[in-house]
């Protein structure tokens, strides 16, 4: 099995109590040897998000509309044109530091990426020291692209589309505020066709905590003609990941996917 990863946009993570959740897909993938490459991108245009979704399924909404609800994103009929919230909406300082994908049938790790230790806050800091470190980091990042880290590009071999059940482990840290009803809704499209929706509950997370959760992705079989089209159309398979705390949208990340086993773009 060939597994290749390239870290350009480190995913964010950390560790503590581990939780496993599962969700069924509206369409998906299935079984053994897969290679995967991941590229970080710039995440689209800078500044506050300028597009969103209404209950009608429209994928555009003014950036100042900060009341995007879970029900609205569940009714989207296409990938969003831009981010539905600004990077500054993450007032809970949720920071993903590690991400791993594994085939649950074979146990094979298909992909793993982590933020370098130098970019993670060391353990054992007091709350004041942690807040000071965060403030120093923000001052260094003032001129950076506000959407950096919100977009990632993956390249898989065609075999990935044969996988039936995949475990995605994410590790993350939380800032000074607790997370109540932390939830992720992930929508996958091929062009304007909805492939699958995943809806995961993280539950409650303590302030200044490190957390590990594994989401179980259960994929039904895709029609052979659709699989062939997805393989021949790299990066036309895309996803939106929406993160809510107490039904308030606090993070929106994007990704696109290729299944042709090609080189990193």
UniProtKB/Swiss-Prot annotation:
GO terms for cellular component: cilium. InterPro entries: Ig_E-set, PDE6D_unc-119_myristoyl-bd, PDED_dom, PDED_dom_sf. Tetradecanoate binds at residue 154. One of its GO terms (biological process) is nervous system development. Belongs to the PDE6D/unc-119 family. Residues 1-69 are annotated as: Disordered. Adopts an immunoglobulin-like beta-sandwich fold forming a hydrophobic cavity that capture N-terminally myristoylated target peptides. Phe residues within the hydrophobic beta sandwich are required for myristate binding. The gene is unc-119. This is Protein unc-119 homolog.
